[in-house]
Amino acid sequence: PSSWTPLPESPHKHSHPIQGQGVSGGVQGGQVYSLQALILQSPLSPEPPIILVGQQLTPEVIPWLRRVSGLVLAQGGATSHGAILARELEIPAVVGVGSAHLEYLLSFPWLTVDGDGGIVQGLKECPPIAASPATNSLPQHQPEAPDSPEFPTLPVPLKIFATLNQLTSLNALRDNLPDGIGLLRSVWFFLDLWHGEHPHRRIAQGHHGELRTAYQKRLQQCIQAIHPRPLFYRSVDCRAAELQSLGGQETFPWTVGGSFAHCFDPSVLNLELEVLHQIDCGASDLHLVLPMVRTVEEFRGCRDHYQQFLRQQGRHQSPLPLWIMAEVPSILLQLPALAAAGVQGVVIGPGDLCQYWLGLSREQSGPLTYELDHPLVHQVILQLLRETQRLKLPTILSSHSGHIPQNYLEDYLRAGLWGITTELPHLKNLRQTIAQSWHAS
């Protein structure tokens, strides 16, 4: 089919609101479309306003997110990937409504989504709120000057970086004046270039050159938007949940992804290394961040492969610093060995770190969704920072919401925190909060 097929009219004469977890603010109304039907129909020309409703976000749907007005998911929490993307694109979103409520919500032709209150309301008629999301037409105004009320100079030696998931966010990136891109999530950023297939299969089918050209063009746009500020490129994590539904993943050992995947099959890492070096990483202040490093051996495997790549290119020294993600508890015990092996910096990922320490899932909803506000996570981050400071490794803390309690932040700064990276909608608030807190103290 070449168009979106509306769902049949609800048999319910009256609706009752469904409570979930609001993860991306705003109130929006629109016509209901099933996420599963969207995947099966592959629509070509959807007309807003559209509210997508489904179990969870899958890769096939991501290119359509820029065209929808609201998102409702049965699964997920505040740090789930669907929530992260919705916030970056400024789409009102409610997650965790529960599978039992999906059929009920899908029986209505219209919905309103309250991303602030976490409420979804089924409607028989078109709601009054029917505008497209503001993000679908990003502002083109000139950014405020540094040290304005919008962007105050921080009274502490701390870098504020932006986390980037989508190419469409580049205009917002320019408007928010971050100190650079603290984390470019390659899995999301390049997902549409894989055309529904796992990257390993796509490369094996002979698309290496095509992918390299497309990767380079897209990454170059990011560098031009922030030059001369740094960009921290997180390498593709082939174990990522976002890739598990793609064609060809069945041949890959999903239980051992992360950086081990690059040791098992370096084809994706080779593609990334070629692109990063073609861009002249020495002049562009690029950093390669290896994902989900569990052991020193995994890092050494990636490092050795990179050194072999350099020799093949006729280079003897690397202009590309190698960083790692600190996402699993084992990193805390191995930092000295990792530094000795050549790690040059660390990005702390509290979303994964929290779920592995506390036995939680980032895709779950409800009160047990912690990130930076749990005392145990706070203590783990403090220990990581004290050790990286002792080893003279610059460290960035990734925060989805940008909300860090002031007393925690003071502890992190004393322990040697170098930078924070957060989602674009939270950059201004984070900078202003830090400035106001220190001026008041």
Q: Which positions does each model-derived feature cover?
A:
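Acidic, glycine-rich flexible loop/linker segments
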Residues: 2-179, 183-184
